[in-house]
Regions:
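Glycine-rich phosphate/ribose-binding loops and adjacent secondary-structure elements
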Residues: 52-55, 61-93
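Non-catalytic, usually N-terminal nucleic-acid engagement modules in DNA/RNA processing proteins
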Residues: 1-69
Length: 93
């Protein structure tokens, strides 16, 4: 993900790995992986693509977290929008 700084407009790149590292550096008790938040009304093709991307990001985040667990927990967000089958699959992954 690329953001722009509110201070000077500089581009800031945030990967699943750098997101976890930043939360660890801040001493977060609970780390949340990056995910894509979609609007409520979205077509199935876009929903499935977002679902797959988010789960790839979660795996990368978990790998980074497990390299240096410390006393921090990681929680994943359940995805799938209003598609109950995708939400169930998200819980099982």
């Amino acid at each position: 993900v690329i953001f722009r700084s509110y201070r000077d407009g500089e581009k800031i790149f945030l990967s699943p790995e750098t997101s976890v590292e930043a939360q660890k550096d801040l001493g977060s008790d609970i780390i949340i992986p990056l995910d894509e938040l979609l609007p409520f009304q979205v077509d199935e093709k876009r929903l499935k693509a977002s679902f797959e991307r988010t789960h790839r990001w979660e795996l990368r985040s978990l790998h980074t977290h497990l390299q240096n667990k410390q006393n921090q927990a990681m929680f994943a967000v359940i995805h799938g929008g209003t598609n109950l089958d995708l939400r169930q699959e998200s819980c099982q992954r």
